[in-house]
Amino acid sequence: MDLFEYQAKELFAKHNVPTTPGRVTDTAEGARDIAAEIGRPVMVKAQVKTGGRGKAGGVKYAATPEDAYTHAKNILGLDIKGHVVKKLLVSEASDIAEEYYISFLLDRANRTYLAMCSVEGGMEIEEVAATKPERLAKVPVDAVTGVDLATARSIAEKGHLPAEVLDAAAVTINKLWELFVAEDATLVEVNPLVRTPDNQILALDGKVTLDANADFRQPGHAAFEDRDATDPLELKAKEHDLNYVKLDGQVGIIGNGAGLVMSTLDVVAYAGEKHGGVKPANFLDIGGGASAEVMAAGLDVILHDKQVKSVFVNVFGGITSCDAVANGIVTALNMLGDEANKPLVVRLDGNNVDQGRRILAEANHPLVIQAETMDSGADKAAELANK
């Protein structure tokens, strides 16, 4: 679960990570009141779970409460990369001498934790990695020994932070590691971590991702879930325990097994290159033991995505037999009625494939097109999405 910045800063405060005071609001009047309470210039910051807020006009400096009110009115309702701003963080502005970068994350490729630190903060870390790789330190972290003050200082040194701030930076880095472990996070990122003119270290912006698999031992994390900010299709999928991630393409994808679904995304993206650049619209894995009802629920989710122009169902029958999948498709189409108005390309193979294909053939639904192979199915789905 990705957190809003204000939620990340709540965790910073909980774990004694130094940051600037502030509060969240959903009105311009609230922004003015918070600025008046702080009594100093403030930053008015859009709360959206995406980058590029500053370039989109979602982060503004306000010298007075009235300035905060004006900026808040302009930012609320702003569309930033498809995310509509509904909340604002109003926090005390800080004098900045230098900007740094620090993060902890899971390094899945090497099956370890990783600290990343750079003296080049305040810019996209991908840009630093591409243009100044020598300025970005990547330090593996032992899960058993963790990050004590000495290790934290070493991370700061490797990130080329100035000698005069190493001790203060080490304390903050150590606290961020404690947060990372205690909250079962998969990412804790501060960009920028700043040095003030009097050599204080402050976390001015924060990004935290929590591991949903640890929810059973983190009951407090439920309070961070914002259903208003979650895509309604993802909420609908979650209600049916479907593994669904919305993407930005036009071809809906359903498969059984994460590996097959990932392969299907690649094949559809490749096919889309010759059909107007269409792309996959989602990741949806119905799992290894899915029933007809689960298949129907998956189709219900995808067919309600307005971006979807066609659907590719790619199933290799194993535990989930092809006849169960076929019955699920027929059930979903009957249930949706006139709401089902997008072509479905279906490729079935494996357990009970003949029965599955026969069920679809006998149903003779005008929207269903059967494909023999994954490649031909992906090509047909991409072609239909481009019409």
Swiss-Prot record:
Q: Where is the ATP-grasp domain?
A: 9-236
One annotated GO molecular function: magnesium ion binding
Q: Does the keyword Ligase apply?
A: yes
* One GO cellular component term: cytosol
- Subunit note: Heterotetramer of two alpha and two beta subunits.
Q: Which residues bind ATP?
A: K45, G52, R53, G54, S94, E99
Task: Please give the function described in this protein's UniProt entry.
Answer: Succinyl-CoA synthetase functions in the citric acid cycle (TCA), coupling the hydrolysis of succinyl-CoA to the synthesis of either ATP or GTP and thus represents the only step of substrate-level phosphorylation in the TCA. The beta subunit provides nucleotide specificity of the enzyme and binds the substrate succinate, while the binding sites for coenzyme A and phosphate are found in the alpha subunit.
Q: What phylogenetic lineage does the species belong to?
A: Bacteria, Bacillati, Actinomycetota, Actinomycetes, Mycobacteriales
Binding-site residues for substrate, renumbered to this chain: N256, G318, I319, T320
What organism does the record attribute this protein to?
Answer: Mycobacterium avium (strain 104)
- Indicate what this protein is called per its UniProt record: Succinate--CoA ligase [ADP-forming] subunit beta
Which top EC class is named for this enzyme in its record?
A: ligase
Question: Which protein family is it in?
Answer: Belongs to the succinate/malate CoA ligase beta subunit family.
Give the residues annotated as coiled coil: none
SUPFAM superfamilies given for it?
A: Glutathione synthetase ATP-binding domain-like, Succinyl-CoA synthetase domains
Q: Does the keyword Magnesium apply?
A: yes
Q: What is its EC number?
A: 6.2.1.5
> Can you supply a Gene Ontology BP term from the record?
tricarboxylic acid cycle
